[in-house]
Amino acid sequence: AIVQNRVIENPQTLATAIKIGNPASWKLAVNAANESNGFIDCVTDDEILEAYKMLTREEGVFAEPASAASLAGVIKTYKAGKLKKGDVVVSVLTGNGLKDPDNAIKICNAPIKVDNNIEEIRKAIGI
């Protein structure tokens, strides 16, 4: 809504916590972006899922998709070449993944099953 500068009647996203077509803090968000020399952009659900998986895989952080959206924006900005050395970037992750377990269940890999045998366990984990 803010990026398009219009109210969105029926927003669609897997990030349910930010599925708001008319944000109550619209002016505050725009002011914060302006005062910090920042900007507000949008990301796709695919970009959110990429960041969501990366947080879990690389950092061990289980964030909800709405929180991962901020990192998705950083990744998008980086890939577009809009970040330069020395830039200060803040990505806030406030929501725990347990707020939205359905998305985690949909994208996680099936558990690995092995026999109750130390050699089978070593083989499964690659040691």
Model-derived regions, located:
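Substrate-binding/catalytic subdomain of NAD(P)-dependent oxidoreductase enzymes
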Residues: 49-79, 87-89
